[in-house]
């Protein structure tokens, strides 16, 4: 979204390594003329349209998260399924949404982090834990609806 002096008001960052809605992000963002930066490790090859860019980082465990955390600003938007990254970005004033269309905010992030921590403890103790449920058409539709709502609110529409 651009204002009168053509200065970018906000940007969208995408934790792109395992993001199932890259095409949808580009389509919606392009309709609002919003810059999108897909951040991915060298282990994942990807191409994007002419209005987006890809930043490739090392394949280290948290390299994508660190890049996004170091470059995101207040009012920027991030698409990620990573609860830890979401928590960090919320403290910076960013809007964070999952690829399933779940909005992360301060009221739910602590419980999500606690659930993740408990699952990690259970796995280390040898217990079986559930993985994420399958990504469904409804998840994709919910994401598009929520993402469009975020961008239209930012654009003042």
Curated annotation (Swiss-Prot):
Signal sequence, renumbered to the chain: none
InterPro entries xrefs: UPF0178
Domain of life: Bacteria
Transmembrane segments: none
Recorded family membership: Belongs to the UPF0178 family.
Protein name listed in UniProt: UPF0178 protein BH1374
Naturally occurring in which organism (per UniProt): Halalkalibacterium halodurans (strain ATCC BAA-125 / DSM 18197 / FERM 7344 / JCM 9153 / C-125) (Bacillus halodurans)
């Amino acid at each position: 979204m651009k204002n009168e002096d053509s200065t970018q008001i906000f940007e969208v960052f995408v934790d792109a390594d395992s993001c199932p809605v890259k095409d949808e992000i580009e389509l919606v963002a392009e309709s609002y003329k919003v810059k999108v930066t897909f951040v991915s490790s060298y282990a994942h090859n990807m191409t994007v349209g002419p209005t987006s860019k890809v930043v490739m980082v090392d394949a280290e465990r948290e390299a994508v998260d660190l890049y996004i955390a170091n470059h995101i600003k207040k009012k920027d938007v991030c698409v990620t399924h990573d609860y830890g990254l979401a928590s960090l970005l919320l403290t910076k004033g960013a809007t964070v949404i999952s690829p399933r269309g779940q909005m992360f905010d301060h009221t739910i992030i602590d419980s999500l982090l606690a659930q993740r921590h408990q699952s990690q403890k259970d796995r280390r103790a040898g217990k079986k834990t559930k993985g994420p449920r399958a990504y469904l058409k409804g998840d994709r539709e919910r994401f598009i609806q929520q993402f469009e709502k975020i961008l239209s609110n930012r654009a003042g529409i």
